[in-house]
């Protein structure tokens, strides 16, 4: 099971960032640093909510507290930076774990660089960002590397889901008994 956050309220600041797996090998003799890219990198997002009315605040606060108590994952629908036009429902993709390329099949309009999408494999959502689109071969270059091998899997551009756990303390602020903010970080777990 998973717990899905409500619609992101206006004024919310979401700061996505890549959690890298691998590392940098720094030469002890002054040579160039080598970047080791490994399968397993994933996204996290810092979420900072604005001042909310009590009902909305209670809904947002209940989600991470419920997930913490049950051990369920949280789902945050990532807002698209580019929304016009979104690729249609029914776009499917196939790729190989460890690759950063995904072949897609479906009608126009095509995905664009900078668009978030997610797909589900084995009951888990995997979030990716489109880096480049080859319209001739219908290949997407994505970040991070694919952690699983999707096969004719539905790509969700309308509601891209970051699924994971809160990786920070669950805390909120009250000022004169008014909910004035809530900050947390959610990190993909699959």
Regions found by a protein language model. Give the residues of each.
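Extracellular/virion structural assembly segments
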Residues: 1-190
């Amino acid at each position: 099971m998973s717990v899905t956050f409500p619609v992101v309220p206006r004024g919310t600041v979401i700061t996505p960032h890549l959690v890298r797996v691998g590392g940098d090998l720094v030469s002890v003799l002054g040579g160039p640093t080598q970047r080791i890219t490994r399968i397993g990198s994933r996204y996290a997002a810092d979420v900072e909510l604005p001042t909310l009315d009590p009902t909305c605040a209670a809904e947002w606060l209940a989600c991470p507290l419920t997930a913490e108590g049950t051990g369920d994952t949280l789902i945050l629908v990532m807002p698209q930076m580019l929304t016009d036009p979104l690729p249609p429902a029914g776009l499917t993709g196939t790729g190989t774990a460890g690759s950063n390329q995904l072949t897609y099949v479906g009608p126009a309009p095509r995905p664009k660089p900078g668009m978030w999408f997610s797909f589900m494999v084995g009951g888990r959502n995997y979030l990716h960002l489109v880096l480049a689109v080859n319209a001739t071969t219908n290949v997407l270059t994505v970040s991070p590397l694919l952690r699983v091998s999707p096969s004719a899997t539905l790509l969700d551009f309308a509601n891209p889901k970051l699924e994971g756990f809160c990786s920070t303390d669950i805390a909120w602020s009250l000022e004169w008994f008014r909910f004035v903010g809530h900050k947390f970080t959610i990190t993909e777990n699959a």
